[in-house]
Amino acid sequence: MKTGSEFHVGIVGLGSMGMGAALSYVRAGLSTWGADLNSNACATLKEAGACGVSDNAATFAEKLDALLVLVVNAAQVKQVLFGETGVAQHLKPGTAVMVSSTIASADAQEIATALAGFDLEMLDAPVSGGAVKAANGEMTVMASGSDIAFERLAPVLEAVAGKVYRIGAEPGLGSTVKIIHQLLAGVHIAAGAEAMALAARAGIPLDVMYDVVTNAAGNSWMFENRMRHVVDGDYTPHSAVDIFVKDLGLVADTAKALHFPLPLASTALNMFTSASNAGYGKEDDSAVIKIFSGITLPGAKS
């Protein structure tokens, strides 16, 4: 097994989570290559010590021992890997591909089968923890795949993860766990927004309400993280409203296939969809609070 700078890892998708993962690779001493359509993100990673960056991972694919794909959805994963300029055809046989996007179980299985056709190993490995944990190499990874995939991706997992859960050998299991996790995440944000909106309507200063909740039993990680954005009036997207429209849509699809009712998740999906329809889709997911009328929210601090 190669280690340190002998191990070449590529990452496609340099958003807040992907950039954090890439910087963790650099910090771990791995030879790091990055790809993103955003030239500024590529420049940031190059300045941090990456071996190379590009708008297309195919340009450096033959150098890689492992590839992490962390883009928005399954369609983007398939385009990155199997599109006209897809990277899969350029990877060395035996290269391990870690797919960390939040996607449906069926898509994970389909992608794994297609990668196997190129003699490539896939780890179905969605991640969580937010941008800060990603930057610190402390993400939670929910992974399923073969022992070989886990072994070949060991340097990658060690660099980015605070905790790795091995869900099983079948691709799709990791994605299912992540989807169920996103049910909770979305409901927590929606419930937090509803509570803060009620506080605003009742005339309670939102900084006071936030302080009370974060020091009491009603707190959650999502409330503490996301409602801080509301208090600060800062909706710069760390994870956008439209991400939860997608993720809670995956939750709904999963439940529908199992004929299983999800009343809270369904309501949360409707709230995020309403926020997106109102024009807030690209704002931080905490902007779901803006669907409530008759309240005044804090403005951005200068």
UniProtKB/Swiss-Prot annotation:
UniProt xrefs under PROSITE patterns: 3_HYDROXYISOBUT_DH (PS00895)
Reactions accelerated catalytically: L-threonate + NAD(+) = 2-dehydro-L-erythronate + NADH + H(+)
Superkingdom: Bacteria
One Pfam family named in its UniProt record: NAD_binding_11
Keywords: Carbohydrate metabolism, NAD, NADP, Oxidoreductase
Gene3D superfamilies: N-(1-d-carboxylethyl)-l-norvaline Dehydrogenase, domain 2, NAD(P)-binding Rossmann-like Domain
Record flagged with keyword NADP: yes
Keyword Repeat set for record: no
GO BP term, example: organic acid catabolic process
Catalytic residues of the enzyme: K178
Molecular-function GO terms, alphabetical: NAD binding; NADP binding; oxidoreductase activity, acting on the CH-OH group of donors, NAD or NADP as acceptor
Annotated NAD(+) binding sites: 7-35, 102, 246
Enzyme Commission number(s) of this protein: 1.1.1.411
Role, per record: Catalyzes oxidation of L-threonate to 2-oxo-tetronate. Can use either NAD(+) or NADP(+) as cosubstrate, with a preference for NAD(+).
Family per record: Belongs to the HIBADH-related family. L-threonate dehydrogenase subfamily.
Record protein name field: L-threonate dehydrogenase
Organism: Escherichia coli (strain K12)
Designated gene of the protein: ltnD
